[in-house]
């Protein structure tokens, strides 16, 4: 870091909670941003004119990949893909596959959900995205 950023960081460390809260409010106003935690890992930028009208449909940003069914002869291939996607151990992934219909991934982006669906279907499983 540069000397300027080091100096700012040291000054921030000395602020009380009340002062830090006031600083956040001033930064939000000065730069037109929000310090609220983004939903779904993506930050929504406000367009000109402030808040969006209530009539606009809210676009879904988080999706679930649901494993609907797996043919008996495709279980091993689907199990391997489920393990890759979830990072589960062999027993946990096997239990998930055998408990279909079951959510494989939850709260993921549309692209990731489409990719997971494609991979599981290529292995022989039936998948829906909600």
From Swiss-Prot:
Entry annotated with the keyword Protein transport: no
Biological processes, Gene Ontology terms: translation
Any GO CC annotation of this UniProt entry: cytosolic large ribosomal subunit
Keyword Calcium tagged: no
UniProtKB keywords: Ribonucleoprotein, Ribosomal protein
InterPro entries: Ribosomal_bL12, Ribosomal_bL12_C, Ribosomal_bL12_C/ClpS-like, Ribosomal_bL12_oligo, Ribosomal_bL12_oligo_N_sf
Family annotation (Gene3D superfamilies): 3.30.1390.10, Single helix bin
UniProt GO MF annotations: mRNA binding; structural constituent of ribosome
Quaternary structure, from the entry: Homodimer. Part of the ribosomal stalk of the 50S ribosomal subunit. Forms a multimeric L10(L12)X complex, where L10 forms an elongated spine to which 2 to 4 L12 dimers bind in a sequential fashion. Binds GTP-bound translation factors.
Function: Forms part of the ribosomal stalk which helps the ribosome interact with GTP-bound translation factors. Is thus essential for accurate translation.
Protein family per UniProt: Belongs to the bacterial ribosomal protein bL12 family.
Stored HAMAP family: Ribosomal_bL12
Entry protein name: Large ribosomal subunit protein bL12
Gene that specifies this protein: rplL
């Amino acid at each position: 870091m540069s000397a300027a950023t080091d100096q700012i960081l040291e000054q921030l460390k000395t602020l009380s909670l009340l002062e830090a809260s006031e600083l956040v409010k001033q930064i939000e106003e000065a730069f037109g941003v929000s310090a609220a935690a983004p939903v779904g890992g993506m930050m929504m930028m406000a367009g000109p004119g402030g808040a969006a009208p209530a009539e606009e449909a809210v676009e879904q940003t988080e999706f679930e990949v649901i494993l609907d069914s797996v043919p008996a002869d495709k279980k091993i291939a689907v199990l391997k893909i489920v393990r890759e996607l979830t990072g589960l151990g062999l027993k946990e992934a096997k239990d998930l596959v055998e408990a279909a219909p079951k959510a494989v991934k939850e709260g993921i982006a549309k692209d990731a959900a489409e990719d997971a669906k494609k991979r599981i279907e290529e292995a022989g499983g039936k998948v829906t995205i909600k």
